[in-house]
Amino acid sequence: MDDDDFGGFEAAETFDGGSGETQTTSPAIPWAAFPAVSGVHLSPSSPEIVLDRDHSSSIGCLSSDAIISSPENTHAANSIVSQTIPKAQIQQSTHTHLDISLFPLGLTDEKSNGTIALVDDSEDPGANVSNIQLQQKISSLEIKLKVSEEEKQRIKQDVESLMEKHNVLEKGFLKEKEQEAISFQDRYKELQEKHKQELEDMRKAGHEALSIIVDEYKALLQSSVKQQVEAIEKQYISAIEKQAHKCEELLNAQHQRLLEMLDTEKELLKEKIKEALIQQSQEQKEILEKCLEEERQRNKEALVSAAKLEKEAVKDAVLKVVEEERKNLEKAHAEERELWKTEHAKDQEKVSQEIQKAIQEQRKISQETVKAAIIEEQKRSEKAVEEAVKRTRDELIEYIKEQKRLDQVIRQRSLSSLELFLSCAQKQLSALIATEPVDIE
């Protein structure tokens, strides 16, 4: 601690003499560990101080800490100073109140050496004794202050050494933590690379499985298309044979009845057949378009729902496969339509040729016999025509029903194959998705 932390203060006390003597200044100079303030006034209610000079020696045992720490110590210092006053002067000042004005003074060389200038009173020998005692007490207090300063410096040195040790330990701890963090980062990178490698292996396996499934699906579609084409060809042949037999029977039964009405009936039948075929073709086209639209919408919805779960590579593969299958189905349907149209045109040409041949033969044979029986046979021919029209309508309805049933079977097969394909893809995607969070954890 520096000397500036303590201030030296002087106070002049005046005492009234009972014999009319001049007022004398007290040689006692109080000293205490006060900060530099303008002035300190003792309260008027402080008790009167009457002390014996014999007790002055016992006050030197006061500790320096008690004097420095609290305002009570300042009062003790004032009491120490007041003990040095001669008893005669203290008795004269019992009824007076102390008004001590303290002024900060600069420290001089004498203060650094532990001495303070005191006001001497040559007339009173007791004042000299009290000054000597004060100097002794001040020297003891200065010694104690020096000791406390040395202790403070020693404590500061201990604190600095402890702080240095703390910094060293903190640096070592931080280095250990950094090394642990680096090891954890290396381990994390290794695990991440392992996880990426496993994901790549799973993706490769998934692509291979998808390629195998696509090949199987293509083979199944080709076999189903071949079977359908063969079945349709057989049905067409059987229907043509049935129609040929029926036409032959009708021609044999009506070769004597038909002459002039055959042309009109033929035209009517042709128109009706054309209308029926047009209606049938339109209905089939509408049904096929509706079915294709429904299948497209279902396929789109299924692909959209599956695409949300799949990754980009799987999405591209599935979409390409679906588009190829759509194109193949459309091509197959177009080929079937073309085949049906060509076969139907051939059948119509054959039927018309046979009808024309039979008509020409019958005309030559029945020109003479038919003219007389035309009126009688008109009613019968009308009834027969109506029955034939009804039969043809029934046969066309049955044929349309069979075609619808076959189309439904084809659609069900294609939808079942698509469902199998999508279920396999979903299972593979779910397996991939289930393995990813486990690897991440």
Swiss-Prot record:
Function: Involved in the regulation of membrane traffic through the trans-Golgi network (TGN). Functions in close cooperation with the GGAs in the sorting of hydrolases to lysosomes.
Modified residues (Phosphoserine): 43, 46
Major localization listed first in the record, in broad terms: membrane
GO biological process: Golgi to lysosome transport; protein transport
Oligomeric and partner information: Homodimer. Interacts with GGA1, GGA2 and AP1G1.
Topological relation to the membrane, as annotated: Peripheral membrane protein
Region (Disordered): 1-26
Name under which the protein is recorded: Coiled-coil domain-containing protein 91
Region spans: Homodimerization: 210-413
Region (GGA1-binding motif), start-end ranges: 1-16
Gene Ontology cellular component annotations, sorted alphabetically: cytosol; Golgi apparatus; membrane; nucleoplasm; trans-Golgi network
UniProt keyword annotation of Transmembrane present: no
Keyword list, A-Z: Coiled coil, Golgi apparatus, Membrane, Phosphoprotein, Protein transport, Transport
Tissue spec. comment: Widely expressed.
Organism whose genome encodes this protein: Homo sapiens
Keyword Hydrolase applies: no
Gene Ontology MF, one: identical protein binding
Residue runs in coiled coils: 130-209, 249-407
